């Protein structure tokens, strides 16, 4: 299945629920007035875009409508698509400029973190990059085993220690291996942590110190994996992790299983954190690089 078709299918629930309602609402109006904008804002908020972002979209839409002299409500959809694509632009590409580069993957348990790492490793390997996986989620034996399966599937080397080992020591070993084997990217799994588990946040700080000491000039990404089905809770999680540890990007999983795709806008506009990848299915190649234009097109289903 093609790249665009995958995203389009993955956004079907959001498109049907949110964009479908917007489309019906616009058809019920014969002119563009305050009531139309109020209803649009309400529908955007219901679509998990968030109140501040919904207001921002509608204010920009008002200005564009006025400036371009648009009178027909049916013309609003294409403007809305443009505004949303513009809002999502910036920072969506991974920074992997150095060899090795390092990607630290964080998130609470149950969001699809280890699966995301496996799919990302597979995608980068397909691009010809030599990838090493670091099994630094040492709290759960199952996490190490799961990562081993993904390492095998994506044909990547895995660096691991036994359950309960010091996660920072695993990262140190992975960095040493990457230097010795001239690897391009190290992807590090970490324990599923909640913002309020102080020892887990301390552990993350220790991991960061090891990375900064051993790879001071390396390109570093800190990716937070979020479950799209949790809607505004995902936005709250992103804010808490951002404050605690700093985040360079978001991987939004399970978009295909929810009508809450609007959280992409809430995260990028509300928090200023770019979405770098989206998960739109169960298959190994269903983790897709996030591209604002393709996302907006798929959401409004303009192109086939």
Label each PLM-derived region with a short phrase:
Residues 12, 34, 51, 55, ...:
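Electropositive phosphate-/nucleotide-binding environments in soluble metabolic enzymes
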Residues 191-193:
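Short glycine-rich anion-binding loops that position phosphate/pyrophosphate groups of nucleotides
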Residues 1-25:
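Charged, compositionally biased N-terminal leader segments and the immediate start
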């Amino acid at each position: 299945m093609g790249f665009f078709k995958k995203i389009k299918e993955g956004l079907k629930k959001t498109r049907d629920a949110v964009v479908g309602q917007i489309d019906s609402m616009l058809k019920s109006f014969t002119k563009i007035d305050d009531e139309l904008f109020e209803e649009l804002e309400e529908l955007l908020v219901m679509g998990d875009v968030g109140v501040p972002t919904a207001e921002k979209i509608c204010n920009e839409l008002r200005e564009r409508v006025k400036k371009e002299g648009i009178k027909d409500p049916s013309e609003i959809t294409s403007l809305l698509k443009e505004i949303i694509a513009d809002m999502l632009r910036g920072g969506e590409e991974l920074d992997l400029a150095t060899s090795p580069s390092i990607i630290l993957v964080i998130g609470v348990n149950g969001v699809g973190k280890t699966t995301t790492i496996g799919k990302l490793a597979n995608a980068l390997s397909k691009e010809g990059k030599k990838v090493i996986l670091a099994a630094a989620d040492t709290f759960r034996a199952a996490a190490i085993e799961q990562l081993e399966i993904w390492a095998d599937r994506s044909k990547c080397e895995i660096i691991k220690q036994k359950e309960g080992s010091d996660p920072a020591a695993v990262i140190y070993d992975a960095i040493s291996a990457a230097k010795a084997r001239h690897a391009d990217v190290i992807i590090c799994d970490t324990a599923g942590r909640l913002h309020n588990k102080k020892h887990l946040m301390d552990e993350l700080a220790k991991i960061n110190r090891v990375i900064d000491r051993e790879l001071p000039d390396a390109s570093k990404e800190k990716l937070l994996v979020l479950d799209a089905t949790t809607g505004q809770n995902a936005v709250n999680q992103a804010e808490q992790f951002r404050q605690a540890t700093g985040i360079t990007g978001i991987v939004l999983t399970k978009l295909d299983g929810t009508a809450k795709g609007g959280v992409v806008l809430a995260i990028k506009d509300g928090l200023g954190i770019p979405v770098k990848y989206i998960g739109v299915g169960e298959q190994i190649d269903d983790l897709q690089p996030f591209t604002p234009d393709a996302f907006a097109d798929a959401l409004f289903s303009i192109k086939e």
